[in-house]
Every structure is written in structure tokens, then in C-alpha cells.
Amino acid sequence: LTAAYTFGESGLTLSVADLWWAGQGRGKYFNFKSHETAHHFEAGLAYTLPVEKFPLSIAWYTMFAGMDKKLNDKGEEKQNYSSYVEFNYPFSLKSVDLNVTCGIVPYKAARQYNCNGFAVTNVALKGTTAIRLTDKFSLPVFAQAIWNPRMEDAHLVFGITLRP
């Protein structure tokens, strides 16, 4: 669940998200107690550079409450404030809209991102185009290759977009 607000044409977006990663049948969804919940509450700030020929966007997300914990020197569980930073660069080639993504974990976030320090955790390329089916209808399709070098994990995602 995400709530976001974009500040006019400034390129700045502020967001707050409630992320649920426990999985089906694990944890109680409506339990929001700090040391029991499976929710992660995250604040985000995104900015797109106001340069038409270089529309790079930069986003920083930090978990500020919920399950994102670490043990301090006394062995007490404390909020970890795990963060993720993402850079996106959109561009087009012929009739295909492309987006290159690079995501990093800037510092230790062992429990959430399995990182003991700075790590590249997301490298992706997404392509979107429309397949013309009739004179009046085109089907928007996309394909995305995603790689997490830190986890040595890769995914291919394909999809369609239906609009009224």
C-alpha cells in the first residue's frame, strides 16, 4: 500500500509505503506492534532531473518502522533504517520505450537486503511497445530483464497493459 504526492511540475515526489513481506499464512496482517509485525513502513523521496535530454530520476527509500530491525551492542532489537537508492534513465529507440535501472543498498542492511555494506542489488532493462492488433486497438506489452548482482539472482518479466 503506497501513498504518494508529486509536487506539481517540480519533478519531486514524496511517498510512504506499508510493505508486507511475510507471505500468505505467516504473521498476522493487522498486527502493527513494533517487535511483532511483519510490516515494513518506508518513506521515499524521488526526483527527476529537469533536463529534457537527460531525464534521470533518483529515488531514496528508507524503512522507518516495522520489521526492519537490528541488534545493537547490548543485544537489543532496534530500528535499522535500511535504505535503497534507485536510478532510472528512460529513453526510446524507434517504437520501443526503454528504461535502465540501477539500484543500490548504500550501507549495511543485513536483515532486509542481505548486505553488510554498500551493494548493487538491482540492474534492469525494461522495454515497452504497443502491438497493433486492429486499426483501433493496440496491445501495450513489456519485457524486463532484472539482475541482482548481490544475490546472484536474475528474472525475466513479461506482461501486457490493459487500459479502458
Which residues does each predicted region cover?
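Transmembrane beta-barrel strands of outer-membrane/channel proteins
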Residues: 14-18, 58-62, 100-104, 141-147
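Surface-exposed beta-loop-beta
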Residues: 114-116, 142-157
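Outer-membrane beta-barrel "beta-signal"
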Residues: 125, 152-164
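A C-terminal functional module that forms or caps the active site or interfaces directly
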Residues: 85-88, 99-101, 105-128
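Structural signature of outer-membrane beta-barrel domains
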Residues: 19-23, 63-67, 105-109, 146-150, ...
